[in-house]
């Protein structure tokens, strides 16, 4: 395969990482369609493109749970609704098979997401989860699961306002049924079920531009095992560079530089307090209680990893977490999988007591985050991860370039359903480069 072909292959593979072609400066001319072309979304309570927002808050606040039908919309005759009991191993296996065979795959069928059962248990069952919010569509005759969507409860803070909502995720329709327009019906059905609990807002993300993003962040990628990435044709050799040079460029120390260590149950109280104080700087953020924080952050082997740094007095001053979502490599004689780490939540007290954007506060935080995230990359590499991904959300712009994260080819858009909101900075400038000065005001991270 030529280097040009490898470059094209890389562009295709990046889409697997939720990196879709997206150019913030060209949304209007390239990705954004006329509102009338959004046959489904034009009927929903979402902010229209170019809508002048005068006040933040719910778009439609007139409905009550008793106004919502007790029965779902009818499906085509060959299909039936189901509630997926993810506590049942067989039903969880159905979700596992559907996602791993249909969620995302490159055109050559070389790489495929490998959602583990442990990952699904973590992502689908946080505190307060509802079985009836795990919505499926099955073939009547065979009972095969061919469609799925999940909602999980989340309390958001949107510029200081508490917004009781859900996160929508894992929307998946079998690849052979994409023409049946099951996705809009799945969205309507999970909305109906959530509305019955008197919840009217939702947060979701995607690479496709819909009406209307509240924020857009860019992906960045840090090779941890460049040699393997090259061997499996996940990355190309840049012009005027040798393999030896590329391997040397991305080589990390064998062990962390700081006294970082695995977060344990005994650290949760301090880390939770640190997290809440740190997150207050962001305009779109989760409002976790301690049980939710414990669920999402404490280490689960092969799923999520969290680490803390303590000062000389034993106080937790920093924590960092990342989750693992590998690819299966199909028909490769050398490798069966590709390890991928995703930046999750972190916090540091480095700039506490300073204005967030002051020169001194910024420099203190930049230095601390460079140490913290570099150690996270080392730990991820030692866990056999081959690439580390991060968005430009949170304060990530302070370390991305310094730590050799390369800008990805696409963007992740954040959407609030049934909620008007002024735009929130996503950590990128108009020319799409990392915005170290303004950074991002998006604090929430979705799987």
Swiss-Prot record:
It is found in: Cytoplasm. The keyword Iron-sulfur does not apply. The active site is at residue 447. One of its GO terms (cellular component) is cytoplasm. It holds the Pfam family NMT_C. Its EC number is 2.3.1.97. Tetradecanoyl-CoA binds at residues 38-41, 171-173, 179-183. It is an enzyme of class 2 (transferase). It catalyses: N-terminal glycyl-[protein] + tetradecanoyl-CoA = N-tetradecanoylglycyl-[protein] + CoA + H(+). One of its GO terms (molecular function) is glycylpeptide N-tetradecanoyltransferase activity. InterPro entries: Acyl_CoA_acyltransferase (IPR016181), NMT (IPR000903), NMT_C (IPR022677), NMT_CS (IPR022678), NMT_N (IPR022676). Keywords: Acyltransferase, Cytoplasm, Transferase. Monomer. Belongs to the NMT family. Adds a myristoyl group to the N-terminal glycine residue of certain cellular proteins. This is Glycylpeptide N-tetradecanoyltransferase. It comes from Kluyveromyces lactis (strain ATCC 8585 / CBS 2359 / DSM 70799 / NBRC 1267 / NRRL Y-1140 / WM37).
